Amino acid sequence: MLEIARTAFLREGYAAASMSEIAAKVGGSKATLYSYFPSKKDLFAAVIEEEVQQMLAPLFEMDETQGDVRTVLERFARRFLDLLLTEDTVAFYRLIVAESARFPEIGQAAYQIGVQHGLDHLAGYFLAAMERGELRRADASVAVAQFLDLCSGELHRKRLFGVVGADDRDEVEKQVRNAVATFLAAYGAVQARAARLRSSAP
């Protein structure tokens, strides 16, 4: 059911997708579809949640205990970009952005289900790294948002405009190295030690 709805939303857009047509392709009645999903918004939210879970699964399966903070962040950034640049992710991103102007609840749902979930997961790692002295103590939620923006950056914009493809490894590796280096220049262990020295100074 969700796969059929997913195809309809990507092909027709949220506004034009018909619950009746989706029900017909599923093989049941419209009433049956509404018994599972009371509204088209609920169905779309379920599709987004399913899509996000599949997209983010490789990130949440990462073993964050293996390697120093630079290694872990580079591994995360690489997987994050690999997911962000896929055809499916780009298609859903464009769909959500296009529909959010008319249906702001769609954008809000996508943010809570996808973006916020990812932010919360990574914030847990950042907090632990701050406790270990590997990162400078700071607001973890702000640090995560800044790190993810550094990861996506210009490469994501190029992908959305069709300048690069999903499998441009040289561009991905360049973005990963630059993002992690810039982030650690602000939040890394040297900055953490300097902050501790300042706080202990008479």
Set out the residue ranges of the language-model regions:
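Short, structured helix-loop boundary elements
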Residues: 19, 41, 45, 66, ...
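C-terminal peripheral helix-coil segments that are non-catalytic and often amphipathic
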Residues: 71, 75, 79-81, 120, ...
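Helix-turn-helix
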Residues: 4-42, 46-47
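Amphipathic alpha-helical linker/stalk segments
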Residues: 47-76, 84, 88, 122, ...
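Short secondary-structure transition hinges
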Residues: 56, 82-127, 169
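Membrane-interface starts of transmembrane alpha-helices
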Residues: 136, 140-144
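Short hydrophobic clusters on alpha-helical segments that form packing/core surfaces
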Residues: 1-9, 80, 183
